[in-house]
Amino acid sequence: MPNPWTGTGNPYTRSEVIERLNDTLSKGQAIIAAGAGTGISAKFIEKGGADLIIIYNSGRFRMMGHGSTAGMMAYGDANAIAMEIGEYEVLPVVNEVPVICGVHATDPRRRMWHWLGKVKEMGFSGVNNFPTHTIVDGHFRGVLEETGMSVQKEYEMVALGRKMDLFSIVYVGSPEEAAEMAKAGADAIIAHVGTTVGGSIGVTNAVVSWDDTIRRTQAIIDAAKSVRDDIFYLCHGGPINTPEDADRVIQATDCVGFVGASSLERMGVEESLTNLTREFKKIPLERKK
């Protein structure tokens, strides 16, 4: 059942979230998960019919006017920021949609079992691995792997979450990571193909092609499917910026949904505020005598 104290809304059990997502699919609808960095975003994302709302620190930076990658930098306590957004902004205004907490699993200052207990107690229905080292590569990724901040800790966080009856929806950047997340017990896997294009603070050149997007997405799905057959697959990032873009990937792969953060929250604000302000500026003024 939903919240046992109020009878409605968060927190949901893991099986209840899964049941809701399967119900969406049974209606012939794609699963839409949306990142929210403010209460007002979450409120109207729910009104639009999203299936999941994900809270992570990058949402706060987005709504400050900065690029999402700021959430990967040492500009604040990622875990505390996500918890604060959830407690004071999102959970109080979301009525029914399951709310997921972004967890920086490699944070060396926290006992992850203890932190996930707080996440659960706060009323979140699941966890997401953000900030995530799965989208870090090259020399720096090697340094992280060798100095106690390995992506292995993200797999361990997901396994802990499963033991604690928390739904898990996770980012991966490669087939190898997808297989490991499947082994850890992830319920939903997001094929992350890079920072989203478009808008005032999206990438322009640091983006993969459409062919690579589709190829990488399906390769991630195939790897996880070789481990388990009960996972939801969603696409995210890179050139996938509009409903038409998401549909293009869903039709070309085994994805059943899309995760939108910049493409929903940021682009929605950028476009609507710009256009609405322009409409107000069209008001003529004749000098009164």
Mark where each language-model region is.
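Glycine-rich phosphate-binding active-site loops on the catalytic face of alpha/beta enzymes
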Residues: 52-64, 122-138, 188-203, 252-276
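Active-site beta->alpha loop and helix N-cap motifs at the rims of alpha/beta catalytic domains
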Residues: 2-5, 41, 48, 52, ...
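Histidine/lysine/aspartate-rich catalytic loop segments that bind and position anionic ligands
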Residues: 129-156, 175-207
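Catalytic cores of alpha/beta
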Residues: 38-48, 109-118, 174-185, 235-255
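Active-site beta-loop-alpha junctions enriched in small/polar residues
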Residues: 37-39, 58, 102-106, 132-134, ...
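Alpha-helix-loop-beta-strand connector modules within alpha/beta enzyme cores
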Residues: 12-21, 65-101, 143-173, 205-233, ...
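Hydrophobic faces of well-ordered beta-strands that scaffold small-molecule active sites
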Residues: 32-36, 53-55, 99-103, 127-129, ...
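N-terminal capping/small domains of soluble enzymes
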Residues: 1-72, 76, 90, 106-107, ...
